[in-house]
């Protein structure tokens, strides 16, 4: 049996106002996500569902969680493979279908990582060879991502061509 990890978060509704849920349009969807010892995340519903567009919504946070998990595993495999990643940006996106009855589900999330690599170490120096090497690291990251392994919809990875760091350059982003 594997090692179990447990996670806890408090979600606190802050949008009751004076009327609470006396009507569908009467209450705010604003809430806070609190985890002990960490900054509070101000959250709401997606604006399509009467949420505050200035706050994070659960759908965005799910897409972000998938992108973060993939990135962290990718960085792990890059480090253990001798590939010096110096920049990583993912412009991830998800698609959710909502049925006429109001229920819905994600149909897919697409991760679009852009990786900047420092030449040397075990990194390939040819563009195509480096892209193939990084594709293998992305494959391994996807296979290990706890969150991607926990969802029922496809999580696709469409990496951009790798960027080789040039002298004096910073990271991707």
What are these regions (language model features)?
Residues 1-64, 72-173:
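Extended beta-strand/beta-hairpin segments
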